Amino acid sequence: NHTAGILMKWYRDNLGLAEVQQAQQQGERPFEQIAKTASPGPSPLLVLPHFNGSGTPTCDIHSKGAILGMTMSTTRYDIAKGFMDAVAFELRNNLETMRKAGIDIKNLLCVGGGARSPIDLQLKADVTGIPVSTLKVREAACLGASMLAGTGIGAYAGAREAVSCVKTDTTYTPDEKMHMRYNDKYSCYNGLYDILKDINHKQKSW
């Protein structure tokens, strides 16, 4: 979902100021401080992370974000974990869409800011049920550009040979018990967009 980073930035700026201060004091990234506040396992909340419309596979600019299940005992930490869970659920939804098209993804390579968070990487593995790996070269865009350039000048016989430059670093494997817990939550999440679609589209004129 294209709101993944933006969603956590929204949380950081509106609800995570304490974690920002702690991160500054400890020399950490604010996101990692926020991730540390989350309890293991699914959040008690169900979040539709379409705070800026939805990305694939629905691609609906009129879809809106939603947080369901809040009570008087809900904490901002529950919301943070709900956001993280929802982004991972969107990833799983995309993977399942690709599988329906005959593309079976057996492992994931993560790059960018999200690839720097062990907590988030393990979460993605637990939710999707497949291994998630980081790369030895952190600047993946630069690596990809150099691979294409090398292919263009004949340094590689083709793109398949150039891919040999990609080396994995750390791999996060799914926790089966945690995966089963997320399966139950995902089954509820999977119908959330359709349930809220009509309401969200009516809000266009509000």
What is the role of each PLM region?
Residues 1-111, 116-206:
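Active-site core segments that coordinate phosphate-bearing ligands/cofactors
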